[in-house]
Amino acid sequence: MDDVRLTFHAVAEPQPGPGWRARFERSWPAYRGWYLRDGDAARPSYADARRMLLAHMPELAPTWERLVELAGGGDLAARMLTLYDPPPVVRGCSQAVFARPEPVLVRNYDFDPDLLEGVICSSAHTGRRVIGMSDCLWGLLDGINDAGLAVSLAFGGRRETGPGFAVPLVVRYLLEICETTEQALGALARIPVQAAYNLTILDRAGAAVTARLSHDRPLSLAPAPVATNHQQHVEWPEHSTAIASVEREARLLDLLADPVATEPELVGAFLEPPLHSTAYAAGFGTLYTAVHRPAEGAVEYLWPGSRWRQSLDAFEEGSRTVRLPGAKRSKDCSHV
């Protein structure tokens, strides 16, 4: 395979403005195609989507209204930007919390390189400072806030879906309104989600959990703050086998149980198999590793041979191009 180069952009925009509008204009044709892939009738009406956002995440409504304005005020963009009941997306990912010497949340994001936004956003939409990796134009794949809360997502390994929100917006919501893991769990218990996902959460006090979400089951907690791409047990065997979900979980649990492993060793394991994946042609290659440090208000983004540190107090705008060894551009094969 040929190597692929990905460019990541770090953008500071406290409130959505010209920068977001430019990203929307570049991305909207692709997002429009995704949103309508099953036909317009498969998506909720404007009234229903708005009603659900106001009912379950009202604190985000002013930001959503601003985004709709920046996007031109159209019905379709407004509906999509609620991220209520969009087409489901299947991702990879491995994530865990380690507590040596300070608690850190480490994650690998595994997905198709053609479908990654690659934008590290520093924002303050609701007044709280947040750094995170953008997805779906204003959702987040993972991130940290100025209260010291860190959250990351991993697909939960079920085909079944139902009415609810895309989880990247839920991650955004938690980081905008919550300060502690306990508060985040309280919010998750009342927000409907579209598909099965695992959220690993860590706060500044060191409280760490992996919450198992689904559209048709109550919120539950994993025995340890680790997650790959299944929940209590494997329910989509073909998918789990193809992306080595069970093997990756076992590796994370071994690392968590190792009493002498240092933080560099723990983090380094995410850059090696089985946690690091080169299955780019299948849409599940590792695109970045993120080390969230709540005590420092910082996130480090890692790739083989490269590191980019960002913090709430010293955010560096700019771009970094990284090489993914053995990667190959692929067709979109990462939807349910």
Predicted regions and their residues:
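C-terminal, well-structured catalytic/ligand-binding subdomain of enzymes
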Residues: 1-75, 83, 100-336
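Short, glycine/charge-rich beta-strand/loop segments that flank catalytic centers
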Residues: 76-97
